[in-house]
C-alpha cells in the first residue's frame, strides 16, 4: 500500500458526514485566505481537520498571531484551494495530533495532495 493512502478509515470520526473540513487560515489584504502550512523535508504540508474543535485546539497550540483563525471549507472549496496551491502544498496531514507534527506516527498519515484531492472528489 502506498504511504498515506490507507488513512481514510481514521480520517473521519464515527458518524461524521465528511462534507465539511477545517483549515487554519489568515485573511490577506486581497481577501484570499492563506492556509497555515508547515515544512517537512522541504515540502509544504497542509493540516486539515474533520472538526472545528480539533482545529481550534491545534490553532491554540501554535504560536501564531491573532490574525489566524479556523476556516470551514466545503469539499468543493477545499478541492479548489488545493488546486490553487499545487506548487506550494505537496502533502496533506489529516487531523494532526497536538504538539506532535513531526513524529513518525503523525507523519505516517501524510497524504500526497493529489491523492487527497482524488479522495475528496470520490466521496
What are these model-predicted stretches?
Residues 1-123:
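Conserved NAD+-utilizing ADP-ribose enzyme module
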Amino acid at each position: 500500500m502506498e504511504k498515506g493512502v490507507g488513512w481514510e478509515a481514521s480520517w473521519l470520526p464515527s458518524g461524521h458526514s465528511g462534507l465539511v473540513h477545517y483549515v487554519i487560515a489568515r485573511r490577506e489584504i486581497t481577501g484570499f485566505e492563506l492556509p497555515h502550512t508547515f515544512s517537512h523535508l522541504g515540502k509544504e504540508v497542509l493540516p486539515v481537520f474533520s472538526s472545528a474543535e480539533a482545529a481550534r485546539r491545534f490553532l491554540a497550540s501554535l504560536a501564531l498571531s491573532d490574525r489566524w483563525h479556523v476556516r470551514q471549507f466545503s469539499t468543493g472549496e477545499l478541492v479548489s484551494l488545493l488546486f490553487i496551491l499545487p506548487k506550494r502544498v505537496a502533502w496533506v496531514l489529516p487531523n494532526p495530533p497536538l504538539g506532535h507534527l513531526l513524529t513518525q506516527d503523525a507523519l505516517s498519515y501524510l497524504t500526497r495532495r493529489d491523492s487527497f484531492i482524488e479522495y475528496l472528489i470520490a466521496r
